Amino acid sequence: LGNRQMTITVNREYNVHYNKKRIRRLMQILCLKSVCRKKRYNYIKSTPEVTAKNILNRDFHADKSNEKWLTDVTEFKYYVGTEVRKIYLSAILDLYDRRIVSYKIGGSNNNPLVFDTFDEAVKANPDAHPLFHSDRGFQYTSKIFHNKLIAANMRQSMSRVGRCIDNGPMEGFWGILKSEMYYLRKFTSRDDLISAIKRYLHFYNNKRYQQRLNCMTPMEFHRAAA
């Protein structure tokens, strides 16, 4: 955790009121440092069947829950001897409360991974009809996925080609997850990596306080607005 996140966490967990400067000084004394985020490369070229305009247009503000959802897929590596293997995480993030609405983990970056993530989100939020924003990954530009959005009465929005900042909060979430959980260790077991991801996602939604959410967790903020 960085000094800002550490300050929020200490103050909430122990009901104290330390300022960021004091926490930063204590972290320096204890040699506690946050992990730097790494740039992500995760491209699969494809010919899109369906494209959509960038309706979101970097307007990352939302006035209510289920108004705007962002989605993406990221990869994780683990090691079996000298062999490098991968798993993939697909997730949907709500821009209002920054909660992870749904997620799926799989061994392939394929259509079922993304479709199942979407289906789970719709099942858990049957009355939600958000603007649905993604990059131009092959899953999101397929006719099947486009039809799923139509059936759920959702508008589709897509980032411009090569503009990952158009999906900035989603990219930011991947950076938080990996810097706080993944980069801290080398995983040598698929099951251990999957368990670590699941634990972190539960922690993020229910235990990780955010300054932008009035120092509440995503689920606290979500329930407070309900």
PLM region descriptions:
Residues 36-41, 131-136, 150-169, 185-188:
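RNase H-like polynucleotidyl transferase catalytic core
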